[in-house]
Amino acid sequence: MFAQLDTKTVYSFMDSLIDLNHYFERAKQFGYHTIGIMDKDNLYGAYHFIKGCQKNGLQPVLGLEIEILYQERQVLLNLIAQNTQGYHQLLKISTAKMSGKLHMDYFCQHLEGIAVIIPSKGWSDTLVVPFDYYIGVDQYTDLSHMDSKRQLIPLRTVRYFAQDDMETLHMLHAIRDNLSLAETPVVESDQELADCQQLTAFYQTHCPQALQNLEDLVSGIYYDFDTNLKLPHFNRDKSAKQELQDLTEAGLKEKGLWKEPYQSRLLHELVIISDMGFDDYFLIVWDLLRFGRSKGYYMGMGRGSAAGSLVAYALNITGIDPVQHDLLFERFLNKERYSMPDIDIDLPDIYRSEFLRYVRNRYGSDHSAQIVTFSTFGPKQAIRDVFKRFGVPEYELTNLTKKIGFKDSLATVYEKSISFRQVINSRTEFQKAFAIAKRIEGNPRQTSIHAAGIVMSDDALTNHIPLKSGDDMMITQYDAHAVEANGLLKMDFLGLRNLTFVQKMQEKVAKDYGCQIDITAIDLEDPQTLALFAKGDTKGIFQFEQNGAINLLKRIKPQRFEEIVATTSLNRPGASDYTTNFIKRREGQEKIDLIDPVIAPILEPTYGIMLYQEQVMQIAQVYAGFTLGKADLLRRAMSKKNLQEMQKMEEDFIASAKHLGRAEETARGLFKRMEKFAGYGFNRSHAFAYSALAFQLAYFKAHYPAVFYDIMMNYSSSDYITDALESDFQVAQVTINSIPYTDKIEASKIYMGLKNIKGLPRDFAYWIIEQRPFNSVEDFLTRTPEKYQKKVFLEPLIKIGLFDCFEPNRKKILDNLDGLLVFVNELGSLFSDSSFSWVDTKDYSVTEKYSLEQEIVGVGMSKHPLIDIAEKSTQTFTPISQLVKESEAVVLIQIDSIRIIRTKTSGQQMAFLSVNDTKKKLDVTLFPQEYAIYKDQLKEGEFYYLKGRIKERDHRLQMVCQQVQMAISQKYWLLVENHQFDSQISEILGAFPGTTPVVIHYQKNKETIALTKIQVHVTENLKEKLRPFVLKTVFR
């Protein structure tokens, strides 16, 4: 019977449409018993192909297509792994090929268990190679020209399922080669997956011996994977068990904990670790963290359930004492649930590459590798790649892809988005392109590297998996699942920027204050830091900077570190429903049900609410006599909602509880309660470790706010300026002679850096810093290299006021810039002037300057216009920070954003405003009646007095606005001769609604009128429209 060997899969990137799952399905439909894959150079899909075949009752045949140079000729070879030995040889051959190291000698040394096929298209009778081979023939091969001494074998290339797929593959080739469809060669026909019986009949008729050769070749093929654990040996000169025991004992003695119950707990953990064969694993993790600390890196407090291990604490893998804080080792590791311990290593993100190099050098480049991932055609990428080849312009592509949501597939967005569907259906070619995009959506596009994963092995990795070359170290061809399934140690090196922040803060405190802070010794009950959490002042604090967490902190107002840990756990779906109960019970306003005195100590810290997975385990242990290992199995069954397992566990729980003298009714009720909480209960060990890191960050914010904001602004991409301003920091005006490159904070002043100026070349910024001081605008421009004498680079420097120290009129410098550049370039020539003749002009307003600064660097650096308005104001108003709930107040603010909605009942419009008074933000609501009155006045960025009632919602003050009044003092003045054109002027003004009051002065009768019903948005277009009817317009 025919077997399909030469099938290219989607892992021959953009050269096939054969995905594995559909391949199995179609192969069975077409009557195949044996199928193969033969991707070019790589084995990315090999493991999943073999396992998938076995699951689907198909015989897998693993192949590999390579080209190899021999006697100055590239020879195309198809290789077939005939058995497990051949499979391992392919791993090595593919690795050599994907590393650029494959040569004929190496190839010939690795042919045991491999059959070689040379396709008839690449064969000639002049070809002489140092190995035996078959000649692969298809339906179109002229058999009369074949070497009669060589064995023939049926070999048919498959790249798609049906002829209809040829157009899609043509598109993939165009995308791959970055060509238009017209420039891309047509796809070969007859490469679809054909019916097995038809092909068998064809070869039986035309080439029966070849068919027999194929049957003989594949008949005994079978692959066996070695799934045994292959941990590297940490130290071949000493027993890992003894070394781990020595190190942990020394670690506890160093911490002053060589006493009970620590000694018993340590022995218990060491026995389990040794029995499960993980001694080397702990030593490897210890070694990696030791390396980081030897470099002075802050490695954090640990993460996940590993924080429940005393061995990990003794080795300084974690920074949490699990005995003191009642954390469970069995949640991490127990003999009743055999699985690899999972210690993810957090490290400062800026040093991750150094850890990779250490692993490579310490354990060997053949024994360690990063892990591959596959980037796929997402819906937006598929649309963009395909529609581009249909000639769709960029602006149309952008508009179309904007309609695709983050979680959308092409099918779902087409179904739910009317506008998307209308675009697709508007043209025939769009419908065709969309069909192709849907066909390739989800297919691999290229390889990438796992963000965290590293694999290590005791022997060469290529004995188990294929590799390819990478920048810092080798990269696996198998994904993380396949790597672990082959018994290899996968570890996650997680670059955590918060560790970088903490380390940099520690270093800056030492530099600026001469104070050496031991981060791990920070008191987790520090009153000042606890107060910061209680206020919800946690912008920039790991795990607590989102609005949901901030609001939760304001409600809970944690009074001790344990309540911060609880807040982490309550800030989750399900658990958050019990926040009110938690608070009321803590305040004595609600009865605490502890169910049974024997489990009261477990539930008391969380006021009778099961917040943590460990509580479920402890209750099972204390109430029903379960071992902690068995209790962990119960927890897992509950969290995974394994009904069959849970039913069995429930009966066991009830029987064991009754055996201990518990009432059956109480036991059943308790089990149901445990079952409910286990679904969303949090890992307490993880919550504790990450809350400790959050507390350490918050400690710096509470005690050294200038250091905190300096580091956050320079090492984080997020915006912390607003938060700093709310904490009474001020943005300082800088000059060309003082501006730093990165942001700097000194004495509550924020000095914005040159790095914030969009589009400013870094080299130019460095040149400015190296060349200063400058004496004048002319001096600066004279010394500026010609390549930087461009308005696109110079104008932003002028607009943000860097030359105010020489000439405070920014508009004047801008208007003279062209002349200045001519002047400085002619300076010294025969016809040059000795000094520049400036042309005067009116400067920007305070508001305009502030807006330009915001636009260019993201924040205003000069005096805020609102402060100017406040200083001149004759009206009484209250700062946002002094507002009191359930009171009437007037605030002077700037509108940041306006969100308009329609009410569900009447369908009328209302608005939500986000406003600020330069120090604090406030949410403002305008209900339909007020919004209808003031909607024409409201504009983002403008200044207003708002009067209203202060309410509290979600522990945040907000205003229900009753009155709106413009705060800006500028007006639009019109000078007209008489009343002749009043109607035309009124009509024009009405077409430019805004927030600026209008005053008309009539020259003939010296009459001045302030318009009460018209306010405008002043633009050049408005000025042009008015020109025929007025003598002059002035905005001041």
Curated annotation (Swiss-Prot):
Q: List the record's Gene Ontology CC terms alphabetically.
A: cytoplasm
Report the InterPro entries cross-referenced here. Answer: DNA_pol3_alpha_NTPase_dom, DNA_pol3_alpha_thumb_dom, DNA_pol3_finger, DnaE2/DnaE/PolC, DNAPol_HHH, NA-bd_OB-fold, NA-bd_OB_tRNA, PHP_dom
Q: Name the EC number(s).
A: 2.7.7.7
Q: Name one Pfam family in it.
A: DNA_pol3_alpha
Disulfide bridge map: none
Subcellular location, principal: cytoplasm
Give the catalytic activity.
DNA(n) + a 2'-deoxyribonucleoside 5'-triphosphate = DNA(n+1) + diphosphate
Q: Name one GO biological process term.
A: DNA replication
- Top-rank lineage group of the source organism: Bacteria
Q: What class of enzyme is it?
A: transferase
**Where located?**
Cytoplasm
CDD domains this protein is in? DnaE_OBF, PHP_PolIIIA
Q: Report quaternary structure and partners.
A: DNA polymerase III contains a core (composed of alpha, epsilon and theta chains) that associates with a tau subunit. This core dimerizes to form the PolIII' complex. PolIII' associates with the gamma complex (composed of gamma, delta, delta', psi and chi chains) and with the beta chain to form the complete DNA polymerase III complex.
Would you identify the family this protein belongs to, as annotated?
A: Belongs to the DNA polymerase type-C family. DnaE subfamily.
Return the PANTHER family for the record. Answer: DNA POLYMERASE III SUBUNIT ALPHA
Q: What does this protein do?
A: DNA polymerase III is a complex, multichain enzyme responsible for most of the replicative synthesis in bacteria. This DNA polymerase also exhibits 3' to 5' exonuclease activity. The alpha chain is the DNA polymerase.
The protein's name: DNA polymerase III subunit alpha
Instruction: Provide the taxonomic classification.
Output: Bacteria, Bacillati, Bacillota, Bacilli, Lactobacillales
